[in-house]
């Protein structure tokens, strides 16, 4: 469903001054009406460069510091809240429900069309965690997209954080079950210290909506497991990317059973070595960058750490002439 500029209406966004949002409408799915939300923050001066950012699982866009750092570098910043997440969730929907990650192609394509209509000819596509998996495949499946010039991945979800035995035998079985019984539930295993380690009300420094980025989420639908597994299989087989790609990850993974410094200085959600292993299967110009003491969402790491993230990122962009 196309959204020409004449019909697109931006409204003030919850993030405050300078942030706007527009609702993108799509064909209904099995649950009914479907929308996504495009958020933008423009630079003070006209620019032809833009960023499009895609969030992770149980997440939404709230990282204002990231948007403002891109603005300072001369990029207009755009982010999507995908269907059934954050700003885009509707009461008749099951949170985060998806059967195939290609469902999100509609909002990514629509957002890119709008970004082009708004005067940009150069886009850095970016994704965190599940968003990193989604954007990797989007770039691979759209190798000749006229706008996408580079890809920045922040701890992409290239494999389940499970034992080798579970990855080989349990995940494929759960995925097959998910195709037949999509509503069946499975324990999520998400580390319960991660979100509290970030939020200002617990041990962190960030303000975000705990309904949209929940402190705990105990069960996932097998439809999600199936969608992720199918996408990861494609990554594992070796996709081709014809744009420069920067994949950033924390320097280590830990499994804190109670809150400690590891929760704020390492990835407690995904296995770093999985990202490295599967990134090496990608054909193309892919650069890996390890961030000492980084957390899963690297731009939410402690101040000195995230300064390293931005320094490395913007140096890479400069080297790639973006």
Language-model features, listed with the residues they occupy:
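Catalytic nucleophile-loop/oxyanion-hole region of alpha/beta-hydrolase
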Residues: 57-58, 86-122, 305-306
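Short beta-strand element of the alpha/beta-hydrolase
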Residues: 48-56
């Amino acid at each position: 469903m196309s959204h020409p500029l004449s019909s697109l209406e931006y409204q003030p966004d919850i993030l405050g001054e300078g942030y706007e949002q527009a609702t993108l409408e799509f064909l209904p799915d099995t649950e009914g009406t479907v929308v996504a939300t495009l958020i933008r923050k423009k630079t003070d001066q006209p620019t032809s460069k833009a960023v499009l950012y895609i969030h992770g699982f149980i997440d939404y866009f709230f990282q204002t510091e990231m948007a403002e750092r891109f603005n300072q570098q001369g990029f207009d910043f755009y982010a999507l809240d995908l269907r059934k997440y954050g700003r885009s969730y509707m009461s008749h929907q099951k949170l985060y429900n998806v059967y195939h990650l290609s469902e999100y192609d509609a909002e990514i394509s629509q957002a890119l069309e709008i970004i082009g209509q708004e005067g940009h000819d150069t886009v850095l596509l970016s994704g965190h965690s599940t968003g990193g998996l989604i954007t990797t495949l989007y770039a691979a499946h759209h190798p000749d997209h006229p706008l996408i010039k580079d890809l920045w991945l922040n701890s992409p979800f290239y494999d389940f954080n499970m034992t080798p035995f579970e990855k080989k035998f349990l995940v494929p079985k759960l995925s097959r079950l998910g195709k037949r019984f999509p509503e069946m539930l499975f324990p999520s295993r998400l580390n319960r210290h991660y979100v509290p380690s970030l939020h200002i009300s617990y041990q962190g420094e960030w303000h975000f909506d705990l309904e949209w980025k929940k402190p705990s989420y105990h069960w996932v639908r097998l439809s999600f497991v199936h969608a992720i597994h199918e996408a990861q299989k494609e990554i594992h087989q070796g996709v081709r990317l014809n744009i420069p790609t920067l994949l950033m990850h924390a320097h280590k993974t830990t499994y804190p059973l109670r809150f400690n410094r590891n929760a704020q200085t390492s990835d407690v959600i995904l296995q770093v070595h999985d990202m490295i292993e599967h990134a090496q299967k990608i054909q193309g110009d892919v650069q890996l960058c390890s961030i000492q003491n980084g957390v899963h969402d690297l731009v939410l790491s402690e101040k000195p750490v995230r300064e390293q993230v931005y320094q490395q990122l913007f140096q890479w962009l400069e080297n790639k002439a973006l």
